[in-house]
């Protein structure tokens, strides 16, 4: 083989090596980019402990409510990216069973204190990879538990919240994780009039009071608004404010702790 042929052969091998290296770098770079994109935007969070610190107070999470435990907490199935993230066509979304049972609850359609037959559209679905969420800035009447009696309007608050959000998709903004491992969060659901604050709705209907704790309260900057509407609901004797001898959820907890 002549020197010229040898040089040409070396150049071809060198070019092939360079091309292979470039392709390898591009593939590796693309894989890293895809992985970072997935972990940042499309990775599902399955409990409150998995929520990154950078998300608290800054970002909204999208998902579906799969169960409602009482008047101020529920389980949230995180669906990052929504439809664009593959949910409903590549990634499975939990389907809830329709609830045919009619239950009496406080009417909220006409802003009265009259009881009406109202259907919680779906039944709770448990044992799913969900985030336990505690509504921020409010306290709903306590349901019966650990042998303690239920507070008046606790069942109304529970049924109202189930009717309002169970089986529906909404947004939460994580604010902190409480001592029970729940994500304390601000909550928004889409309506024809725009996004609605679920916590504020409950205060307006007299189905929750502004959170009474002296420390650790979270309002996402809306404490003043919550207190104004609590004052209005109280003046109108809406919901729990219609009682002659009112015991707030905070007072109830102190009594039975």
UniProtKB/Swiss-Prot annotation:
Residues that bind Ca(2+): 139
GO molecular function: endonuclease activity; metal ion binding
Database matches in Pfam families: SNase
TM annotation in the entry: 17-34
A Gene Ontology cellular-component term: membrane
Active site: 134, 142, 182
Top-level taxon: Eukaryota
TNase-like domain segment(s): 59-243
Gene3D superfamilies documented for this protein: 2.40.50.90
Protein's recorded name: Probable endonuclease LCL3
């Amino acid at each position: 083989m002549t020197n010229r042929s040898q040089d040409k052969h070396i150049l071809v091998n060198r070019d092939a090596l360079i091309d292979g290296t470039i392709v390898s770098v591009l593939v590796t770079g693309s894989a890293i980019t895809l992985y970072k994109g997935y972990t940042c935007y499309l990775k599902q969070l399955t409990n409150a402990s998995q929520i990154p610190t950078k998300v608290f107070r800054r970002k909204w999470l999208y998902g579906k409510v799969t169960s409602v435990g009482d008047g101020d907490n529920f389980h949230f199935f995180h669906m990052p990216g929504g439809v664009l993230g593959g949910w409903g066509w590549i990634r499975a979304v939990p389907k809830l069973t329709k609830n045919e049972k009619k239950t009496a609850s406080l009417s909220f359609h006409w802003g009265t204190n009259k009881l009406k037959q109202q259907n919680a559209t779906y039944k709770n679905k448990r044992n799913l990879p969900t985030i336990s969420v505690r509504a921020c800035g409010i306290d709903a009447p306590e349901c019966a538990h650990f042998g303690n009696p239920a507070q008046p309007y606790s069942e109304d608050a529970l049924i109202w919240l189930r009717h309002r959000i169970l089986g529906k998709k909404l947004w939460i903004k994580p604010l902190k994780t409480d001592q029970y491992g729940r994500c304390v969060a601000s909550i928004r659901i889409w309506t024809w009039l725009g996004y609605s604050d679920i916590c504020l709705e409950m205060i307006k209907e007299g189905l929750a009071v502004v959170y009474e704790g002296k420390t650790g309260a979270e309002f996402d900057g809306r404490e003043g608004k919550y207190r104004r509407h609590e004052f209005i609901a109280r003046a109108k004797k809406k919901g729990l404010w219609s009682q002659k001898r009112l015991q707030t959820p905070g007072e109830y907890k102190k009594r039975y702790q």
